[in-house]
């Protein structure tokens, strides 16, 4: 079993950082320029986050649109947590099969530099929520 309690727990942490990225005055416009949609299918616990960067929308679970995203990604929620804490190299994780990706992966990789400034914000978000357990679990 993973560190997250349930799907709403994933949405309140990982989903929240996507919302903050889109709302950020510097990062948000750059994500909209990329005009990608990414559907993240997490395990441990089962949860779905669909991010439509072009429209600036984040959807959780059954609220995810039926439209096919440009990219589908699959991973454990704990691995997404590690990524947002700067402790998981996404390219290496994909090479090892720890993270699966289908679709416009090269376009998604171009967006990776936008994530780095959010690592500290994600850690602060977890601390504000009293989720030191997620920080410690990332190693």
Model-derived features: where do they sit?
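Feature captures hydrophobic
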Residues: 1-139
């Amino acid at each position: 079993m993973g560190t997250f309690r349930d799907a709403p727990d994933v949405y309140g942490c990982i989903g929240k950082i996507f919302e903050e990225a889109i709302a950020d005055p510097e990062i948000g416009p750059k994500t909209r320029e990329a005009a990608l949609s990414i559907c993240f299918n997490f395990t441990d616990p089962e949860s779905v986050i669909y991010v439509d960067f072009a429209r600036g929308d984040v959807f959780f679970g059954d609220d995810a649109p039926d439209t096919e995203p440009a990219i589908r990604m699959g991973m454990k929620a704990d691995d997404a947590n590690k990524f947002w804490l700067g402790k998981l190299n996404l390219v290496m994780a994909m090479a090892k099969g720890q993270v699966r990706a289908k679709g416009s992966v090269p376009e998604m990789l171009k967006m990776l530099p936008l994530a780095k400034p959010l690592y500290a914000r994600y850690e602060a978000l977890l601390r504000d929520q009293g989720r030191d357990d997620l920080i410690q679990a990332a190693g």
